[in-house]
UniProtKB/Swiss-Prot annotation:
Binding sites annotated in the UniProt record for heme: 459
UniProt similarity note: Belongs to the cytochrome P450 family.
Gene Ontology process terms (BP): long-chain fatty-acyl-CoA metabolic process
Record protein name field: Cytochrome P450 86A22
Catalytic activity reported: (9Z)-octadecenoyl-CoA + reduced [NADPH--hemoprotein reductase] + O2 = (9Z)-18-hydroxyoctadecenoyl-CoA + oxidized [NADPH--hemoprotein reductase] + H2O + H(+); (9Z,12Z)-octadecadienoyl-CoA + reduced [NADPH--hemoprotein reductase] + O2 = (9Z,12Z)-18-hydroxyoctadecadienoyl-CoA + oxidized [NADPH--hemoprotein reductase] + H2O + H(+)
Mode of membrane association: Single-pass membrane protein
Tissue: Mostly expressed in the developing stigma of floral buds. Weakly detected in leaves, stems and flowers.
Functional note: Fatty acyl-CoA omega-hydroxylase essential for the production of omega-hydroxy fatty acids and the biosynthesis of triacylglycerol-/diacylglycerol-based estolide polyesters in the stigma. Substrate preference is 16:0-CoA > 18:1-CoA > 18:0-CoA.
Subcellular location(s) of the protein: Membrane
Amino acid sequence: MEVSTTMMIVAIVAAYLLWFKSITKSMKGPKGPTMWPVVGSLPGLIENGNRMHEWIADNLRACSGTYQTCICAIPFLARKQLVTVTCDPKNLEHILKVRFDNYPKGPTWQAVFHDLLGEGIFNSDGDTWLFQRKTAALEFTTRTLRQAMGRWVNRAIKNRFCPILEMAQVQGKPVDLQDLLLRLTFDNICGLAFGKDPETLSPELPENNFATSFDRATEATLHRFIMPEFVWKLKKMLGLGLEVSLNNSLKQVDNYMTDVINTRKLELLNHQNGGPQHDDLLSRFMKKKESYSDKFLQHVALNFILAGRDTSSVALSWFFWLVSSNPRVEEKILVEICTILAETRGNDTSKWLEEPLVFEEVDQLMYLKAALSETLRLYPSVPEDSKHVISDDYLPDGTFVPAGSNITYSIYSTGRMKFIWGEDCLEFKPERWMSQDGDKFQVQDTFRFVAFNAGPRICLGKDLAYLQMKSIAAAVLLRHRLAVAPGHKVEQKMSLTLFMKDGLVMNVTPRDLTPILAKIEKFGKVESCAGEHHLINNGIHQPGSIAVNGIAA
């Protein structure tokens, strides 16, 4: 009996090892992460949890842009746990465009986000997604929405963001710039989404119930990704752990949004009787002939907030960090800003600071757009994304992807591969986005630069994002010089969005434009008349300054 049991165990182990050898041999990328029996590549995943995106990039470099791995190497479960990881632009075009219908968000993604986002555009596939996409696309192409974004952004910059930075400058206190940017973009996106300002960016940096509840709901939702589906569903059913926080937070979000929608219905009714007009996204949907349920309208607004809030603020955080350590790039950005303001606002620099740049001025900032794009190439706001495989398929590089498996396309890695961006791919060089004469912004292939997604799901708010980021960046750099506070370490936070782990603590000092105006004068942009020095201090023009082509300098 004992002998037969032993032989049976040996036979089972031998059969498993033969199966394991077969499946690992069939996988693309033998130089990828080490595969272990039963646990697959999970040990490597855990070991590199604090440098996940770099670990994925290292594996992709070793495997020429694509590899396959399995989180759980158990027969009958392996296919579902098989993940194809790629950053090859040819593969990305195939997944995101050519065979778009074969690679939806998939059931896992939708189950995780359903409680928060329902069947909103961010979380849906098929006809549901297509209907919302077409409806939203009509709104995003209107000049009215862009003008509304310009108003919300500039109002927040002038009345809140700049005063907070100026106060920090006067007091000599460092600020967590990432936190300020998150508050700023949250207020802006709420204003644009449903016309209500939560005012999270105020001098006292208050806690807002809706913002806090939305953040907690998002965090709890993302936590579902790191555990098997049956585990978080069981915790939800039993009311355990973060599922309790998620449920409570969703109630707060729902109450807030219900109040917003009911109030807006009354306001739109009053508008028909001569009341004020609203141009936010929610109002524009409510004015349509189609009758949308309140739940649908709520999901429209929440999807828009989730898609537009963290992405812009995170990109700006990495931008200011990169620019603060690259004085050459900072100088070129300032030369561009000052040159344009001299043309549009005249010769007195004090007038440059009275109002933030309007979007006609922002549109001309080509080098600034290049610097922001270069930031997103190296530090994309969403570093990794995934798709579900409907039917067996072959990627352009020959990789077989079976039905039921998943594909992760690494946006972070795409920007860091020599075979895609050249030997200098790890350098911060905005010039790679400019034409040879340096005057025009050059649009890159969307499958090499996937920060805004690509194909039918390409980001509808791309132009609005650039408008917001350029407006904020120009306002800050024109007034202040930023430097990372001594002792503060900038690290990536491992989440779906590429936050800085401990924020971005920076010292704020006055911007001295003297070298910038001298640079402009040297290259013949403006003419010098006489002179001393100029220092912008708290937005106040200092007396005793020189004039450069009439520009106080």
